[in-house]
Amino acid sequence: MKVLLIKDVKNLGKAGEVKEVKDGYGKNFLIARGFAKLATPDVIEAWKKEQAKKAQEEAAEIEKLKQLKEKIESTKLVIKHKAGANGALFGAITNKEVAEELKKQGIEIDKKHIDIHPPIKQAGEYEIDVKLGHGIHAKLNLVVEAE
């Protein structure tokens, strides 16, 4: 029996491959557990269309993230924070504060995607890494001013 693998199956193959398997293994294990479908021409064609659609959506998502990266990298963010006489901040700048300031400028970024390392505890200029997904990273220019 020929089956189209929907998910990766150890010792058999990767998703999207058509494999010849024994009838019992195909019906009772692979198809029953949702790892595969019976490989008919209609099923194979539907799978190919679905994969093409997913690839197109992913390409659109990557393009959108690249545009967001350009917008972030062209932005200079200024945050005012209470500080002592020598420029040492009372507390550190958090990723939540950075996310809120970006939101005020019309850029929606989840605070989990903002990587501030080491913590910012001094007034000055910093470059912060923003992880956008799909391996795309943006560098945000941050200026911390003492209040």
From Swiss-Prot:
SUPFAM superfamilies: L9 N-domain-like (SSF55658), Ribosomal protein L9 C-domain (SSF55653). It comes from the Bacteria. GO terms for biological process: translation. GO terms for cellular component: ribonucleoprotein complex; ribosome. Keywords: Ribonucleoprotein, Ribosomal protein, RNA-binding, rRNA-binding. Pfam families: Ribosomal_L9_C (PF03948), Ribosomal_L9_N (PF01281). The keyword Chloroplast does not apply. GO terms for molecular function: rRNA binding; structural constituent of ribosome. InterPro entries: Ribosomal_bL9, Ribosomal_bL9/RNase_H1_N, Ribosomal_bL9_bac/chp, Ribosomal_bL9_C, Ribosomal_bL9_C_sf, Ribosomal_bL9_N, Ribosomal_bL9_N_sf. Binds to the 23S rRNA. Belongs to the bacterial ribosomal protein bL9 family. This is Large ribosomal subunit protein bL9. It comes from Nitratiruptor sp. (strain SB155-2).
